[in-house]
Each structure stands twice: as structure tokens, then as C-alpha cells.
């Protein structure tokens, strides 16, 4: 599982402890006290870094979900960015997110924590994903392998499209398999991006 990423820093060990607590009981039932106990530190140690559980949760979401995206990014030096590879990369990240234990726990137990990021504002993870997608679009446009267009608008369109496939896939798999829907998403994105 890619979710335990302790790089040796105290902050990461506290986030690891938070992740373990959330995977056990969900966000609403996890407290700073639980996290401190699991991390083997005093509550005030955690409070010095995060004033409340929501701030800590935000940092944990950014760390975990950007790690999913970073692991699946194509190697820009090894392969050109074209419509097909970019579409497949986006589908892979979407699938990886749907299968991420932390993401699944929030969707299953505490989905209300995602509502602000769906209806009201972008989060840091979404901003980072937009920047990443925009960068790939620019590389593909410069080489002529991705259609012309404003990369900022195109990145937002791609992210909006994939949000439905990430958040609502479970509601559409009663008669079809997730792999079939992923193939359709890939086709949509390839046609959207093709020069």
C-alpha cells in the first residue's frame, strides 16, 4: 500500500499515525488524542503543528492523494506526452484514487468531508493536480501531440470529467464493470486531447 510514507520526519510519523487511526475508525471518530497516543507523543506536540483535526486532515489528504498521482505520472524524459499517454495516465490516477484505502474510508464512512471540495472550493490537491495536468498539456502542445487550446481551461475540463469517474463510479457498476467505464473515460480523454 502506498499510504504509509514515513520519511523519518516527525511530521510524517504523525500523519502516519493519523492515517492509521482514520483507517481504523474514520475521520469523525479520530481525535488528536488518538493520533498522539498512536504516535507516542503528547497531544500538545500534535497541536503545535495542527491547530485542529480539519487542518491535519487537509495535510493528510494532500500527502496521500498527491502521492497516488506522483507514482503514476509518465516519465517525461522517457516518453513523449501525447493524447493517448496523457489520457491513460489520468485514468490510472483516477483508478488508483478509487482504490486508495484512505479515500475509500472517507467515501464509505465520512463522505461529508469531501463536500466542500465538490461544491464550494478547490483544495490544495486539486490545485496541484491542475498544475500537473496543465504542465503535461503544455509539453504535448509544444510537440504537436496534444491539440491546441488554453491549457488552464483544458486541465480544468479534464479534472471535472474525472471527478465523476472517481467519486461516483460505484453508482454505475451495477450492469457494467469499472474497467469498461475506465476504457470509456480513456476514449473520451483521447478524443478530447487529440490534435
Language-model-derived ranges and their functions:
Residues 13, 21-55, 59:
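Helix-turn-helix
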Residues 15, 87, 91, 130, ...:
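An amphipathic alpha-helix signature
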Residues 59, 73-102, 154-158, 182:
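Hydrophobic alpha-helical connector segments
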Residues 9-19, 35, 60-68, 72, ...:
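Generic hydrophobic, amphipathic alpha-helix propensity
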Residues 69-70, 116-143, 152-156:
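Amphipathic alpha-helical packing segments from all-alpha helical-bundle domains
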Residues 1-9, 142:
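N-terminal intrinsically disordered/low-complexity leader segments
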Residues 74, 107-116:
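Short linear capping/connector segments at secondary-structure termini
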Residues 104-109, 142-188:
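Hydrophobic/aromatic-rich alpha-helical bundle segments in the mid-to-C-terminal region
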Amino acid at each position: 500500500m502506498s499510504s504509509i510514507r514515513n520519511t523519518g520526519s516527525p511530521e510524517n510519523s504523525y500523519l502516519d499515525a493519523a492515517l492509521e487511526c482514520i483507517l481504523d475508525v474514520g475521520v469523525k471518530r479520530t481525535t488528536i488524542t488518538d493520533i498522539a497516543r498512536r504516535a507516542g507523543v503528547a497531544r500538545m506536540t500534535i497541536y503545535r503543528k495542527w491547530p485542529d483535526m480539519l487542518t491535519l486532515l487537509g495535510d493528510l489528504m494532500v500527502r496521500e492523494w498527491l502521492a497516488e498521482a506522483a507514482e503514476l505520472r509518465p516519465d517525461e524524459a522517457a516518453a513523449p506526452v501525447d493524447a493517448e499517454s496523457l489520457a491513460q495516465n489520468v485514468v490510472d490516477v483516477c483508478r488508483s484514487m478509487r482504490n486508495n484505502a484512505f479515500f475509500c474510508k472517507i467515501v464509505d464512512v465520512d463522505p461529508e468531508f469531501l463536500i466542500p471540495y465538490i461544491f464550494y472550493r478547490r483544495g490544495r490537491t486539486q490545485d496541484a493536480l491542475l498544475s500537473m495536468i496543465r504542465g503535461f498539456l503544455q509539453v504535448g502542445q509544444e510537440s504537436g501531440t496534444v491539440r491546441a487550446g488554453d491549457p488552464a481551461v483544458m486541465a480544468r475540463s479534464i479534472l471535472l470529467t474525472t471527478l465523476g469517474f472517481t467519486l461516483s463510479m460505484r453508482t454505475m457498476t451495477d450492469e457494467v464493470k469499472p474497467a469498461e467505464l475506465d476504457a470509456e473515460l480513456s476514449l473520451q480523454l483521447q478524443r478530447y486531447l487529440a490534435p
